[in-house]
């Protein structure tokens, strides 16, 4: 993947972790379904950082099963129950995602009880 920074952007547009445009070459696209997390004991974690980490790990496992990984992700859809937790989510997202950050959108939505975040990842292989 090649990150493209349009001339109008002198710096990252908002300082948030995403790429404004990516150029992608590949033969096959892999998409995860909307993915939330459960803890390893089947419980839903009560804090955003743990939910974010576990959800990204679950997506990563799905991608591996399809023959790719987080480094192949070019777009992430983030669905959050409360955008006031955006910074907590981004802290984990920055730690776990590759240097060439995917394009991204984020929406505040209603989620199933207990869940704070749901992700859909688009990857190329």
Regions found by a protein language model. Name each.
Residues 1-74, 80-125:
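N-terminal presequence-like segments and the immediate start of the first folded domain
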């Amino acid at each position: 993947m090649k990150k493209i920074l349009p001339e109008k952007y002198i710096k990252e547009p908002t300082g948030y972790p995403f790429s404004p445009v990516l150029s992608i070459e590949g033969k096959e696209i892999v998409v995860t379904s909307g993915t939330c997390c459960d803890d390893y004991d089947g419980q839903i974690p009560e804090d955003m950082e743990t939910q974010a980490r576990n959800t990204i790990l679950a997506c990563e496992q799905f991608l591996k099963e399809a023959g790719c990984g987080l480094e192949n992700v070019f777009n992430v859809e983030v669905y959050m129950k409360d955008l006031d937790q955006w910074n907590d989510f981004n802290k984990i997202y920055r730690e776990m995602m590759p240097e060439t950050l995917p394009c991204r959108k984020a929406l505040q939505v209603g989620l199933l009880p207990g869940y704070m975040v749901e992700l859909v990842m688009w990857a190329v292989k």
